Design a protein with these regions (language model features):
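N-terminal nucleophile
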Residues: 1-242
Length: 242
C-alpha cells in the first residue's frame, strides 16, 4: 500500500512538496534513486523487473509519480508497464494536462493506476479507475492505492499532518520523513510505514521544489523488517541548469 502526500503551491516558498512511501516485495530487484545513465536528465529509482519507476523528477523541475490501484480480484496482466508512465512525462516537455489526456486515451491498456504529473505551471492527476484527468488546484492531497483523497486513515490523517508540518516548518524535510515512518494503529489502512519479512516499505522519499527553482530530492531505503539501508540526497536549481 504505497502513500503519496503532497501539497500544490502551499505557500510563497514552495510550489510542490511531496512525501511518499513505496511499498513492495523485498525480493523485487530495485535500483535506488539516482540519475539514469540512459536518460541523464531523469532522477528516480528504478524497478529492475520492468524498467520503470514509481516516482521521479527531471533537471527542469518536473515531477511524476504513479501508484497501483488495488483491485480484487486483480485484473489480468495487460501488456504495458505502469512504471513507464512517469518516465514518459519526465522525458518530454509535455504540458501536464496534455500528457494525461494522451495517457487517458489508452488507459485501458494498463492495470489500475493513479498518476500525478507536475511542471512549473501546474500539477495534474489521472487515475484510470477514477474518471477524466484533472488539474489540481492549490491545496493538500493524499494518494494511496485507491482514488485521490480516499478515506483511508493513512491518507486522511496523513494529509492533515502534512498541513500541520508545512505550517510549522520553513524546512519541513525531517518532519516529513518522521510522518512517513508512522506505523499507525489497529485501523485497516492506517500505517504509513510497513515493516514485515516479505513485503514492506522499501523507500521513503521527500521532494521539495521551491518557487526559486531550488529542488531537493531525498530517498531513504529500507530492507526486511524495516532495517535502514542506503540513503541518497540530491539538490540543484532547475532554473540554472547543469
Amino acid at each position: 500500500m504505497c502513500l503519496i502526500l503532497f501539497a500544490v503551491n502551499p505557500n510563497s516558498r514552495y510550489r510542490l512538496i511531496v512525501a511518499a512511501n513505496r511499498d513492495e516485495l523485498y525480493a523485487r530487484p530495485t535500483q535506488i534513486a539516482g540519475f539514469w545513465e540512459s536518460l541523464p536528465d531523469l532522477l528516480a529509482g528504478r524497478d529492475e523487473n520492468m524498467g520503470g519507476t514509481w516516482l521521479g523528477v527531471n533537471k527542469k523541475g518536473a515531477f511524476a509519480a504513479v501508484t497501483n490501484f488495488m483491485e480484487t480480484p486483480p485484473d489480468p496482466l495487460p501488456p504495458r508497464s505502469r512504471g513507464d508512465l512517469p518516465i514518459g512525462f519526465l522525458t518530454s516537455d509535455s504540458d501536464p494536462n496534455a500528457y494525461l489526456d494522451r495517457v487517458s486515451a489508452r488507459g485501458n491498456a494498463y492495470k489500475g493506476f493513479n498518476l500525478i504529473v507536475s511542471n512549473r505551471d501546474k500539477c495534474s492527476y489521472y487515475g484510470n479507475r477514477a474518471g477524466a484527468p484533472r488539474e489540481l488546484e492549490k491545496g493538500y492531497y493524499g494518494l494511496s492505492n485507491q482514488i485521490l483523497d480516499c478515506d483511508w486513515p493513512k491518507v486522511f490523517d496523513g494529509r492533515a499532518k502534512l498541513m500541520e508540518i508545512i505550517s510549522a516548518f520553513d524546512d519541513p524535510g525531517e518532519a516529513l520523513f518522521s510522518l512517513l515512518l508512522e506505523q499507525g494503529d489497529d485501523r485497516k489502512f492506517s500505517s504509513s510505514f510497513i515493516a514485515a519479512d516479505t513485503y514492506g516499505t522499501r523507500a521513503t522519499s521527500v521532494v521539495l521544489i521551491g518557487t526559486d527553482g531550488n529542488l531537493l530530492f531525498e530517498e531513504r531505503n529500507f530492507g526486511v523488517n524495516g532495517i535502514p539501508l542506503a540513503s541518497n540526497r540530491f539538490q540543484f536549481n532547475c532554473d540554472v541548469g547543469f
